[in-house]
Design a protein with these regions (language model features):
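Conserved Class I SAM-dependent methyltransferase catalytic core
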Residues: 1-73
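Conserved proline-anchored active-site loop of SAM-dependent methyltransferases
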Residues: 1-5, 85-89, 281, 332, ...
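Short catalytic/ligand-binding loop motif for oxyanion handling, primarily in non-cytosolic enzymes
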Residues: 7-12, 75-78, 93-96, 289-291
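A generic secondary-structure signal for well-formed alpha-helical elements
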Residues: 9-12, 22, 26-33, 89-92, ...
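A general structural signal for short secondary-structure junctions and capping/turn motifs
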Residues: 57-61, 73-78, 100-106, 114-120, ...
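Short linear interaction motifs
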Residues: 62-68, 95, 257-264
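Flexible, glycine-/basic-rich loop-and-beta segments that form/coincide
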Residues: 66-127
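C-terminal target-recognition/interaction regions appended to catalytic cores
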Residues: 130-353
Length: 353
C-alpha cells in the first residue's frame, strides 16, 4: 500500500506523468532493477472498480483520479484527499474489495464538542518595528498569562467587533466566563468522548478518564483579535472571512506582512466550520495555527493537538510526545488511523484468502 498527496497526479517529468511512471515501475520492478527477479504486480484503486482489464488480468483505470481517496466519504471528519494505491502480486488471482462509502459525512463539531472548553494562552503583544540593515525588526512586550487578563482582553475585542459590525446583535448569548480548565494541560481529567460522538467506539478508552494533549498555545495579542473577528464573522455568515473582510472591518486586523495586500494569502486566517468536515490537517499547523482557528469565539484560539488528533481520527489514548511543535507534526503527517483500519481490513482479507 502506498500513499502520497493528490498533487502527485499533476506532476510531470519531460512531459510524462510522474504517477504513470510510478505505476509502470511498481507493476514491473525488474524493469528498474535489472538484476532482480522480482514478480510483477497489479495496481488497484481502493475506491473505484477498474474500467477494464489487460489480457493478464491487470486493472486499467482511464483516469488517475480513480486512485484519490476523499477521506470524508469514509467516516473521517476531514476533507483529506490523498492518492493511495494497492499492489497485488500478479500470480495471486484476487480482486480486492473497495472501501465502503459512509452513509453521511461527519462534521467537525460532532467530534470535538465534547472536549473541555479552554481559553487561548497569552504570549506577547506587538509594540513597534523599525528597519535595520534593510530588514524589519519587530518589538514585543511580554503579556501576563492568566484568566483575568485573558477575559479583559478578549471581552474588549468582542465588544469592539460586535459594535462595529453588528455581529450576533440578536443573539441571546450568556455572559462569558472562564472555563475551569483554563488553558488546558497535557492531561485534562474529564468525561470524553460523549456517547453521541459518531466515532465514540473508535476514540473511547474507558480507562483514560480524560483528554491528553489538550492545551492551547500562547498567542500574539493582535492575532487573538483576528481570531475573535474570524470566529464571530463565521458564526454570522457561515463562512470564514478573507483578508479583504478583515480590512473592511479595520486595517489594524491585517497582519504585518508584505503579502497581506497582495491577495496571495487571502485565506491566511481560516476558521474551521463546525457543520462541515475540517480542512486537511497538515504539519503546518505546528507553525502558528492561523489556518485552524476554533469556531467558538468564547474560546478564541487555534486548535489543540488533541482536537487535531480527533480530526485525524487518532484514538484518545494515543499520546503524542515531545515538544508541541513535534506533536503537531506527528498528527499532521499521518494517514488517518480510522481510514488505515479500513484499508488494513481489505489487505487482511487478501492475505487470509
Amino acid at each position: 500500500v502506498m500513499e502520497n498527496v493528490k498533487g502527485l497526479l499533476s506532476a510531470k517529468i519531460k512531459k510524462q506523468s510522474v504517477f504513470d511512471l510510478i505505476k509502470r515501475d511498481l507493476s514491473n520492478p525488474a524493469s528498474v532493477f535489472k538484476k532482480s527477479k522480482s514478480k510483477k504486480y497489479k495496481i488497484f484503486s481502493l475506491v473505484n472498480e477498474p474500467d477494464s482489464y489487460t489480457s493478464n488480468g491487470s486493472p486499467i483505470y482511464n483516469n488517475n483520479k480513480s486512485f484519490v481517496i476523499e477521506s470524508e466519504n469514509y467516516g473521517v471528519p476531514q476533507k483529506r484527499h490523498r492518492v493511495i494505491l494497492l499492489g497485488i502480486r500478479e500470480d495471486i488471482a484476487h480482486k480486492p474489495e473497495t472501501l465502503k462509502h459512509s452513509e453521511k459525512k461527519i462534521n467537525l463539531n460532532a467530534v470535538i464538542r465534547d472536549l473541555p472548553k479552554i481559553r487561548s494562552g497569552l504570549h506577547r503583544k506587538y509594540i513597534s518595528s523599525e528597519i535595520i540593515d534593510g530588514k524589519k525588526k519587530r518589538y514585543y512586550d511580554k503579556v501576563i498569562d492568566n484568566d483575568k487578563n485573558w477575559l479583559e482582553i478578549t471581552d474588549s475585542f468582542k465588544k469592539e467587533i460586535t459594535s462595529k459590525n453588528g455581529f450576533l446583535n440578536n443573539s441571546t448569548e450568556k455572559k462569558r466566563t472562564i472555563s475551569l480548565k483554563g488553558i488546558g494541560s497535557e492531561f485534562v481529567k474529564c468525561n470524553t468522548p460523549y456517547k453521541k460522538n459518531p466515532l465514540y467506539d473508535w476514540y473511547n478508552d474507558p480507562k483514560l478518564e480524560g483528554a491528553c494533549n489538550h492545551i492551547s498555545r500562547g498567542h500574539l495579542i493582535q492575532d487573538l483579535k483576528r481570531y475573535m473577528f474570524a470566529s464571530l464573522f463565521t458564526k454570522t455568515n457561515d463562512r470564514f472571512p478573507r483578508l479583504c473582510d478583515y480590512e473592511q472591518h479595520s486595517k489594524d486586523l491585517l497582519p504585518d506582512h508584505k503579502s497581506a495586500n497582495t491577495g496571495k494569502f487571502a485565506d491566511r486566517f481560516r476558521v474551521q466550520l463546525p457543520n462541515e468536515p475540517a480542512t486537511t490537517v497538515t504539519s503546518h499547523i505546528s507553525k502558528d495555527g492561523h489556518y485552524f482557528i476554533h469556531f467558538d469565539p468564547n474560546q478564541c484560539r487555534s486548535l489543540t493537538v488533541r482536537e487535531a488528533a480527533r480530526i485525524q481520527t487518532f484514538p484518545d489514548n494515543y499520546l503524542f510526545c515531545g515538544p508541541r511543535t513535534a506533536q503537531y507534526h506527528q498528527v499532521g503527517n499521518a494517514v488517518p488511523p480510522y481510514l488505515s483500519k479500513q484499508i488494513g481490513e481489505i489487505v487482511s482479507n487478501i492475505l487470509k484468502e
